[in-house]
Amino acid sequence: MARPRHLRGLGMCITAVLASFIAGFTVGWFIKPLKETTTSAGYHQSIQQKLLSEMKAENIRSFLRSFTKLPHLAGTEQNLLLAKKIQTQWKKFGLDSANLVHYDVLLSYPNETNANYVSIVDEHGVEIFKTSYLEPPPDGYENVTNIIPPYNAFSASGMPEGELVYVNYARTEDFFKLEREMNINCTGKIVIARYGKIFRGNKVKNAMLAGAMGIILYSDPADYFAPDVQPYPKGWNLPGAAAQRGNVLNLNGAGDPLTPGYPAKEYTFRLPVEEAVGIPNIPVHPIGYNDAERLLRNLGGAAPPDKSWKGSLNVSYNIGPGFTGSEYSRNIRMHVNNINKITRIYNVIGTIRGSTEPDRYVILGGHRDSWVFGGIDPTTGTAVLQEIARSFGKLVNGGWRPRRTIIFASWDAEEFGLLGSTEWAEENAKLLQERSIAYINSDSAIEGNYTLRVDCTPLLNQLVYKVAREISSPDDGFESKSLYESWLEKDPSPENKECPRINKLGSGSDFEAYFQRLGIASGRARYTKNKKTDKYSSYPVYHTIYETFELVQNFYDPTFKKQLSVAQLRGALVYELADSVVIPFNIQDYAKALKNYAASIFNISKKHDQQLRNHAVSFDPLFSAVKNFSEAASDFHRRLTQVDLNNPIAVRIMNDQQMLLERAFIDPLGLPGRKFYRHIIFAPSSHNKYAGESFPGIYDAMFDIENKADPSLAWAEVKKHISIAAFTIQAAAGTLTNVL
C-alpha cells in the first residue's frame, strides 16, 4: 500500500539518502580503507577555505533586500510565496532535494474589523483617551499592504476595566516586592509592565499568578532608546509610536498548543481550544512609549521602591493602584479582540546527501516568518542561511560531497512559539534521535555590531574557537586579526580570560526542540552589542514595523561584513561537523562545565546552610558523579586520540558515543511541570525563557524555598533532583566507557 502523502515529512526529503545507504555505507566503510594522510587533511582544509571564500557579503545583501520587501507573517500567502522562492533557489543551487512540509497549527491574529487598543475611561464610562492602533509606516513603505498592527499573539480576548498598577518588568521578584514588601495586591487590577529583562510570556504568567485581569506591555526609553542616537529613520532608536509585537504563550516546549508532543498533521488528534497548552486567560496588549507616558502620568499610590523601578519617561513611576488628582475617578479599559484559528504553515527542507555516512545528519535551520518586514529578525538569518546553502551547492556542483548528510531548514511560525521547527522535530523524532550529529541555528545574524556572541553545548566550544580563528574579523581596528582575536578582546569569558565567552543555551529560537527535548548537540552564533555599555534590551526597534532593510544597511551593518562573518562561522561549523572523519566534539569541556555548574548550584544552596543540615541534604552524590564523568571523559579523549583512522568500525563506534552523549542527559520524564524540557543539565529558566539555567531541576526546587508552606516537602524535592542529576551524569559517564 502506498504511504500516505501527509506522512512523508523527512522521508520525502531524504529518499535518496536512505536508498543509497547500503551502497554508500558498504563502499565507504568496508571496501575502501580510510586514508587519513597529510594530503587528505590538507584537502579537507582546502575545501573549507573554498566554502568560506565562496560566501560574499553582496550576496547576503541581495538576499536580505529581496526577502524584506513585503511582510511575511506566518500563515499568510506572502510567507508561502517566500517559502516557494527559497525552495526554487535551493534546487537551483544544487541541493539534492528541496521540499515544502506543511502543518496545521493554531495561530493568533488581530480582528481586522474590531481593533485592539487601551483607553482611559471616566466615571461615566466615556473613553477620554485611546492608544494608537497603527505604527506610522517608514519612508518608502507607505503603500505596502497587509501590515499587521501591533498585538500580542494568543492574548485572551476581552474588555477588562479597572485600576492601573505599575509592576516594573513584571518579573517574579517585582511581584514579590509588591506583595511582600509594599502590601500591594494586583488582584482584579490591570497592570502595566515594561518590556525587557525576561520573556514577555513570563511577564504575562506572573501577572496571571498575581490575580491581574489584564496586562499592558510597553517599551520604556530606558530599555529601548540608546543615548545620543536619533529615532528611526534618522537613527536606529525606537520611535515613540512603535510597539513590540510578540507571542505571550507559555508552551514550555510543547509546540502547537492543540497537539502537544505530536506533529500537527491532518490525522492528529487536537485538544479543544479551551484546553490548548500555554494560552493565557487574560488580555494582553503592547503599546508605544508615547501612549505609555499618558497612562502612567497620573498614577497615584506609592512611590517606586528604588531607582531600578524608574524608566526614562517624564513621569513619577508611582505604583498605583489607580490615578490621582483630576483623574482620581478614572479607570483603564482594554479592548483585545484577537482570533485564534488553525492555519497551515510551511517549512522548507533541503538536503545534500552524505557520501560515506548518509545516515548521519547535520542540520542548519532558521525561521523565515516575521512580524512585519523582519529586517533583522529573522531575515538577516534567512539571508545568511541562503548564502550558506548557495555556497555548499557550489561545492557539490564542483564534484565535492560531504561525508555526512546536511539538512537545511527554513522554519515557519517561529514567532508564534517555535511551531514549524517543533512540529518537524516531533514528526521526525525517531529518525533525528538515532541519526543527528548536531543542530546549528540560523536565526538573526545580528542583534548589534560590536562582537560575536555564541550560545552552545559545551561539546561545541573548541570547534567554535577553532573555526573563529580561521575567519577574518570584520571589526574596525582588527583588519589583520581573526574573528577569534576580536571576540576574545571584546568579550572574554568570566571563568577563563584566555578564551572568549560562550553562553548556555536557553530558549527563544528554533534549536529548542532539538536540544531541550531530543538531546541533539546545538549551537547558535550572531553579532551582538557591547553589553558593558549598551544597557538597552535587545535592539530598540525589535519586532516593530521599523525593522527594515534600510535599518540594517544604513546603521547596523552597511558593508554586510558582520553578517558575512556569521555566515562563515555557521557554515564552517556545519562543514566540520558534516565532513570531519572524527566528529569534532570535545567531551572534556562538558566535564569542566559540569564541575562548574555543580559548584555553582552548591554555592546557591549554601545560603540555606542550616536547612541543608536540618533536612540532611547532601550534594556529595552529585560531586561524585561529576568526578566519575570527568574521569570517563579523560579516558575517552585519550582513546579518541589513539583511534585507528583506517578502522572504520572503530571510528564509527567512537563517533556514535560522541553523537549520543547529549542524548544521555535527557530524562524521558522531563522537568516538573515542563515535561517537554527533558535535558537535566540545561533548560530555559522557569522565570525567563530566554535565559539558560544549569541543573534546572535542583535550581527550581530551591527557588524561594524559604517561603514554601511545607519545608520538609520542599527540601525532599531538592534531594530528589540532586538524585536525578547524579544518576543522569553517572549514566552519561557509562556511555563513554570502552565498548566491550
UniProtKB/Swiss-Prot annotation:
The active site is at 414 (nucleophile), 618 (charge relay system), 656 (charge relay system), 679 (charge relay system). One of its GO terms (cellular component) is membrane. Residues 1-7 are cytoplasmic. Zn(2+) 2 binds at residues 377, 415, 543. Substrate binds at residues 200, 247, 414, 507-508, 524-526, 542-543, 689-690. The keyword Membrane applies. Residues 32-740 are extracellular. Has N-acetylated-alpha-linked-acidic dipeptidase (NAALADase) activity. Also exhibits a dipeptidyl-peptidase IV type activity. Inactivates the peptide neurotransmitter N-acetylaspartylglutamate. Homodimer. This is N-acetylated-alpha-linked acidic dipeptidase 2.
